[in-house]
């Protein structure tokens, strides 16, 4: 069975990668689908995000990376996928994602949404959090793959922050 994991992934985080890896254990193929959203200002171009995701998932044999326009359920039908994967961090994610799952079901009754609870260590993590930390000069090395951390530091014209040592 084919599953689609749609999102903006701007940037992809270790939390996203955790969901992808776990999805790969459940489905024959997982397509990580980057939404082309012209109305949203992005840190990285679509091409950069596709390359970042490909590099971050190269260890997974049953992952494809692509971009799409429009509705995720329409893209899923085009790819003959039966499932949309969504990660859940907190209760507010569930409310939003459940509403979207119900909406998608009215549009395409044959497509199911599968929710994967985020691993505890990533329950606070989002692309927005990563960008906010980086813009204020904090280290994001523990939140994204190393090659993406470097890309982020370049975007904000900053060098990689030095670790803060606990001094007593």
UniProtKB/Swiss-Prot annotation:
It comes from the Bacteria. Pathway: Cofactor biosynthesis; coenzyme A biosynthesis; CoA from (R)-pantothenate: step 4/5. Its main location: cytoplasm. GO terms for molecular function: ATP binding; pantetheine-phosphate adenylyltransferase activity. Keywords: ATP-binding, Coenzyme A biosynthesis, Cytoplasm, Magnesium, Nucleotide-binding, Nucleotidyltransferase, Transferase. Its cofactor is Mg(2+). It is found in: Cytoplasm. ATP binds at residues 8-9, 16, 87-89, 97, 122-128. Gene3D superfamilies: HUPs. It catalyses: (R)-4'-phosphopantetheine + ATP + H(+) = 3'-dephospho-CoA + diphosphate. The keyword Cytoplasm applies. Pfam families: CTP_transf_like. GO terms for cellular component: cytoplasm. It is an enzyme of class 2 (transferase). One of its GO terms (biological process) is coenzyme A biosynthetic process. The keyword Lipid metabolism does not apply. Its EC number is 2.7.7.3. The record marks 16 as: Transition state stabilizer. Substrate binds at residues 8, 40, 72, 86. Homohexamer. NCBIfam families: coaD_prev_kdtB, cyt_tran_rel. Reversibly transfers an adenylyl group from ATP to 4'-phosphopantetheine, yielding dephospho-CoA (dPCoA) and pyrophosphate. Belongs to the bacterial CoaD family. This is Phosphopantetheine adenylyltransferase. It comes from Trichodesmium erythraeum (strain IMS101).
């Amino acid at each position: 069975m084919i599953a689609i994991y749609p999102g903006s992934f701007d940037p992809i985080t270790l939390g996203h990668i955790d969901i992808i890896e776990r999805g790969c254990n459940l489905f024959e193929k997982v397509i990580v689908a980057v939404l082309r959203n012209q109305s949203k200002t992005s840190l990285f171009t679509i091409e950069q995000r596709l390359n970042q995701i490909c590099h971050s998932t190269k260890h997974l044999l049953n992952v494809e990376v692509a971009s799409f326009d429009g509705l995720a359920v329409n893209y899923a039908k085009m790819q003959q996928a039966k499932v949309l994967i969504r990660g859940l961090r907190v209760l507010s994610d569930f409310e939003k994602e459940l509403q979207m799952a119900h909406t998608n079901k009215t549009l395409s009754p044959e497509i199911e949404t599968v929710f994967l609870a985020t691993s505890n260590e990533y329950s606070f993590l989002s692309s927005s959090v990563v960008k906010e930390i980086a813009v204020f000069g904090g280290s994001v090395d523990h939140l994204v793959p190393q090659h993406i951390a470097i890309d982020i530091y370049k975007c904000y014209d900053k060098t990689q922050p030095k670790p803060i040592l606990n001094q007593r």
